[in-house]
Amino acid sequence: MWASCCNWFCLDGQPEETPPPQGARTQAYSNPGYSSFPSPTGSEPSCKACGVHFASTTRKQTCLDCKKNFCMTCSSQEGNGPRLCLLCLRFRATAFQREELMKMKVKDLRDYLSLHDISTEMCREKEELVFLVLGQQPVISEADRTRAPTLPQAFPEQQAFLTQPQSSTVPPTSPGLPSSPAQVTSVLAQDQETQQAIGHVSQDHEEPIFLESTARVPPEDETQSVDSEDSFVPGRRASLSDLTHLEDIEGLTVRQLKEILARNFVNYKGCCEKWELMERVTRLYKDQKGLQHLVSGNEDQNGGAVPSGLEENLCKICMDSPIDCVLLECGHMVTCTKCGKRMNECPICRQYVIRAVHVFRS
């Protein structure tokens, strides 16, 4: 286009528009993601268990526990209680006790947790699923809260106190209690006279009098059971020092067996059954006890001093435990398992320690 000033040689900076060719039709802008088909309708509400679509909202029932929708067949209501789905009803029947939850199938535990939108991807053991279920307990109803626990016959007074309705916070005054200062002084004088009389009787007959106390001393069986239960704390990892006898290995779970082997750098890959893990833990326990008896026996024979021949087999870090660990990649055997897992570099060649492996002595 020529400029309008002189209509000659002066060009403006605008590009020249090319006219469209003849016969070409102008096409409107079209979105490639647009579809001429109608948009799909939202998913119809259906039962979470059987997948049946609800024809009407009257057939849709909401579980009070997991807040999911179920049909009349997959939900139940006992008396005037809340309506629950069949799976939540089964879990409520266990009263969320750990022993009862361990008897349930793994599939039911995972289904219950998925209903409550709890991920189970990192759970490898059944105990982990039970732990998550225990942390997802529903709210206890008022009837369960006011229900008094059953106490043994040794506490009849406490049982009667729990069963009495608490109408007011202020207890009623009993007729046997003194209400005036004069009666209080008379009661104290009577108590002193009775104590003196009891003292004279005990001196005459030389028989000690034992007063009954409200605190009950637990028998020896109960104290032993408590000590045995405290030996394995749920929040703490299992260790080889927790075992006192070979019979204790049979009571360990698969997770505890793997923890013991991992802490002592024993490879358990390829073990598909529990008895294979138990064999490796048993061998580790016997090997550890044998080395400890060997060191302690030689020290006792030499009067507390370790002989020069045995000193070569002791850990060069702590000089207390025998050498039962090899450092990789250098391959030096200079430490015990306890010191080997703390080494960043080999104390001999200063090479970086990738990992430590437990070695069984033949």
UniProtKB/Swiss-Prot annotation:
Residues 17-37, 162-183 are annotated as: Disordered. GO terms for molecular function: p53 binding; protease binding; protein kinase binding; ubiquitin protein ligase activity; ubiquitin protein ligase binding; zinc ion binding. Keywords: Apoptosis, Cell membrane, Cytoplasm, Endosome, Lipoprotein, Membrane, Metal-binding, Palmitate, Phosphoprotein, Repeat, Transferase, Ubl conjugation, Ubl conjugation pathway, Zinc, Zinc-finger. The keyword Repeat applies. A zinc finger (FYVE-type) spans 41-93. Autoubiquitinated. Palmitoylated. Its EC number is 2.3.2.27. It is found in: Cytoplasm, Cytosol; Cell membrane; Recycling endosome membrane. It catalyses: S-ubiquitinyl-[E2 ubiquitin-conjugating enzyme]-L-cysteine + [acceptor protein]-L-lysine = [E2 ubiquitin-conjugating enzyme]-L-cysteine + N(6)-ubiquitinyl-[acceptor protein]-L-lysine. Ubiquitous. Detected in cerebrum, cerebellum, midbrain, brain stem, hippocampus, striatum, liver, heart, lung, kidney, muscle, spleen and testis. A zinc finger (RING-type) spans 315-350. Pathway: Protein modification; protein ubiquitination. One of its GO terms (cellular component) is cytoplasm. It is a peripheral membrane protein. PROSITE patterns: ZF_RING_2. Residues 24-37 have a biased composition (Polar residues). It comes from the Eukaryota. Residues 101-120, 249-263 form the SAP domain. One of its GO terms (biological process) is negative regulation of signal transduction by p53 class mediator. The modification Phosphoserine is found at S225, S228, S231, S239. Interacts with CASP8 and CASP10. Interacts with RIPK1 (via protein kinase domain); involved in RIPK1 ubiquitination. Interacts with PRR5L. Interacts (via RING-type zinc finger) with p53/TP53; involved in p53/TP53 ubiquitination. Interacts (via RING-type zinc finger) with MDM2; the interaction stabilizes MDM2. The RING-type zinc finger is required for the ubiquitination of target proteins. E3 ubiquitin-protein ligase that regulates several biological processes through the ubiquitin-mediated proteasomal degradation of various target proteins. Mediates 'Lys-48'-linked polyubiquitination of PRR5L and its subsequent proteasomal degradation thereby indirectly regulating cell migration through the mTORC2 complex. Also ubiquitinates the caspases CASP8 and CASP10, promoting their proteasomal degradation, to negatively regulate apoptosis downstream of death domain receptors. This is E3 ubiquitin-protein ligase rififylin.
